[in-house]
Amino acid sequence: MKFVDEVKIHVKAGDGGDGAVAWRREKFIPRGGPAGGDGGNGGDVVLEVDPQLSTLLDYRYIREHKARNGEKGSGSDMNGKDGADLVLRVPPGTVVKDAATGEQLCDLGAAGERVVIAKGGRGGLGNMNFASSTNQAPRYAEDGTPGAERDLVLELKLLADVGIVGYPNAGKSTLISRISRARPKIADYPFTTLTPNLGVVGWRERSFVVADIPGLIEGAHAGAGLGHQFLRHVERCRVLIHLVEGANPEPGRAPKPDLDAINAELAAYSDELARKPQIVAVTKIDVPEARAAGVKLQKLLGRRKKPVPVHLVSAVTGEGLDALLDAVGRALFKEARPHRGGGGKKLAKPRARA
């Protein structure tokens, strides 16, 4: 299935039905009074979270969405039927914005969560409502009001606990396939991963969701290499695994400059991304030069005023993966590191608005 994470749609709620002008026509009542019923209310446009969905693909091809109009009132005090609501199902993690202003209208995450995004028009009153002692035969009724309509932008942000970031071909897809049951496309060239992949990782008696974010390049914060689409998914992640390729065949590439370049892109996109907990790992250490580069980066970052741990891992042999997942689990669940001679102590939604 093609992954679609941003679409623009137009929604139109149903119009209210007009009230009726009618009169009583019963036998033996030659001068019956007003009997025009009210119009029905127009249907609302409702967004509902469907956990079975993982993409906005359906809305790529169908942009116009309209709820049913309310029916007109009729004689004999008969009110028109209300228009049916139109329910648009979206995947968890959908952010809804007004296309004209950019204002965020709601952030839908929980399964079954619903929000009325366009309110149906009100049905008009029939002439029976306007009868009075001074006007016993009103010859007018009220028109229904139009339903709301607006252009919307739907953005999908993946709901993952951990995001794996790094340059293209840094080994992100291989890692997620090794630590979870996810099976992304893997090949030895950049940009193999064109859409995010999700995998569930078991850790001790818990589990967490990992997203393999497609490779970032310099200028991603400004949209280079589809950077905006990719960085959007990192925003929801609580912890980042920053993969750095130890042995890179491209000239001018090395672990430390790669690490700094990606961190600069995260910071340029948003301060929040720059502040996220990050675990650094050098990949492909089954290759001797990659291991040597990883050790060098360990020493370099270890000399900082606030040392940064660097994990050396190989998704091929499995070396270092357990230690990496332990670091991720502790960061996620805020679990204290065990002391020598003592056991470790465990420490310890968006509301939508229309």
From Swiss-Prot:
Main location per the UniProt record: cytoplasm
Cofactor(s) this protein cannot do without: Mg(2+)
Keywords: Cytoplasm, GTP-binding, Hydrolase, Magnesium, Metal-binding, Nucleotide-binding
Domain Obg: 1-159
EC number of this enzyme: 3.6.5.-
Chain sites annotated for binding GTP: 166-173, 191-195, 212-215, 283-286, 314-316
Described purpose of this protein according to its UniProt entry: An essential GTPase which binds GTP, GDP and possibly (p)ppGpp with moderate affinity, with high nucleotide exchange rates and a fairly low GTP hydrolysis rate. Plays a role in control of the cell cycle, stress response, ribosome biogenesis and in those bacteria that undergo differentiation, in morphogenesis control.
HAMAP family: GTPase_Obg (MF_01454)
Subunit structure: Monomer.
Protein name per UniProt: GTPase Obg
Annotated organism of origin: Anaeromyxobacter dehalogenans (strain 2CP-1 / ATCC BAA-258)
Gene: obg
